[in-house]
Amino acid sequence: MSFIEEFINKGYFHQCTDLDRLTTITKETKIAAYIGFDCTATSLHIGSLMQIMILRLLQQHGHKPIVIIGGGTSKIGDPTWKDEARKILSKEDIAKNAEGIKKSLSKFIKFGEGESDAIMLDNAEWLDSLNYLDFLRDFGSYFSVNRMLTMDSVRLRLEREQHLSFLEFNYMLLQAYDFYYLSKHYNCSLQLGGSDQWGNIVMGADLTRKISGKDVFGMTTPLLTTSSGAKMGKTAAGAVWLNEDLLSPYDYYQYWRNCEDADIVRFAKLYSELTQEELNKFESLAAEDINSAKKQLAYELTKLCHSEQAAKSALETAVKIFEEGQIDENLPIVVLEQEVLQAGISAYELFHEAGLASSKSEARKLIRGKGAKINDRLVEDENMIINTTFLLDKNVIKLSAGKKRHILVRV
């Protein structure tokens, strides 16, 4: 199966500037393709997982993935589908975030000097040195303001009479210039992104084609939500991060273990590397035993992101907690100062401090709603004082919020 055929088969395809021509070229030769990532956090989350799997698929087919970190464009902010302007990041924040993003990506793709090895570039390398007058003279005439105003990302802001700064308006020009620069210096012929980036991608392809005459393409993926309409990557407890310093492998496993029944076959197709035969068996399993299918999905995706050992550990921890009622040290751990526990802390404050409630009032609601347990015993008094007498073996206290969120408090 070719790259494009597998791309479509896995459910990644939404739109392409010239699908037939791109299919032919990717069969005949190896290309370089790029995807850009925002520099807004020290890790990517599962909202970017489809794009990451596409980079991985590119590499598996012998094509060269180029990862662009928007160090330059992050200083401006992309207005795409945003109701408000983004916070502008400092150079120090961008550098720190870029390091974390490369860590996320390195779990899935190989960086290096080989022909199909991925490279990571920061568009600040070429955007920071742009002379504004030279840019207007050399490239300004290729952009149509009439066309830019019709793009949904701009049009919606204007229709709602929301502020759209000239700073943000320039983002489209700079992203288009990225494609031209990568085509010229890295022989990049394909830009990939979410469907919300279609207008920006087409502008870049058009600019490159007009100036260089090269065959370049843009291709987008559908914007994913869960079956209930929730945005991928976000939960009530926060983002589902890929880096283990922000989210433990166990919590990553639990996210997929607890996904909605209607999503698991689609997620297996999008995010796992099960063969077609294995996917067929998985679909049959999901129809017969949804919980076993969810365990398999969680295991496969945790193995891909964190390692087979991490997946095994997460599975064993889940079994001990949910099926055997034991305490497992692989649960997420929160450290509490010994003096705090010696003095005593109220139950609702402990749940808030441990991160199982976003506020003290939320912690009170959790306890009043019979959703809080300490050492597997229901907490009925939100003001109950928790002290060192609650410590179990190995100096831990087990906290549970609902049936699926568990952590250990260690002193």
From Swiss-Prot:
Catalyses which reaction?
tRNA(Tyr) + L-tyrosine + ATP = L-tyrosyl-tRNA(Tyr) + AMP + diphosphate + H(+)
* GO terms for cellular component: cytosol
Q: Care to name a GO molecular-function term for this sequence?
A: ATP binding
For this chain the motif 'KMSKS' region maps to 231-235
Q: Where in the cell is it found?
A: Cytoplasm
Keywords, in A-Z order: Aminoacyl-tRNA synthetase, ATP-binding, Cytoplasm, Ligase, Nucleotide-binding, Protein biosynthesis, RNA-binding
Supply the InterPro entries for this chain.
aa-tRNA-synth_Ic (IPR002305), Rossmann-like_a/b/a_fold (IPR014729), S4_RNA-bd (IPR002942), S4_RNA-bd_sf (IPR036986), Tyr-tRNA-ligase (IPR002307), Tyr-tRNA-ligase_bac-type (IPR024088), Tyr-tRNA-ligase_bac_1 (IPR024107)
Q: Which positions in this protein are listed as binding ATP?
A: K234
Q: SUPFAM superfamilies, from UniProt?
A: Alpha-L RNA-binding motif (SSF55174), Nucleotidylyl transferase (SSF52374)
Give residue numbers for sequence motif 'HIGH' region.
39-48
Q: Name one GO biological process term.
A: tyrosyl-tRNA aminoacylation
The chain positions of domain S4 RNA-binding read 345-411
What EC numbers are recorded for this enzyme?
6.1.1.1
- Positions bound to L-tyrosine: Y34, Y171, Q175
Its assembly, as annotated, is: Homodimer.
Task: Give the family from UniProt.
Answer: Belongs to the class-I aminoacyl-tRNA synthetase family. TyrS type 1 subfamily.
The free-text function statement in the UniProt record for this protein reads: Catalyzes the attachment of tyrosine to tRNA(Tyr) in a two-step reaction: tyrosine is first activated by ATP to form Tyr-AMP and then transferred to the acceptor end of tRNA(Tyr).
Name of the protein: Tyrosine--tRNA ligase
Organism encoding this protein: Rickettsia felis (strain ATCC VR-1525 / URRWXCal2) (Rickettsia azadi)
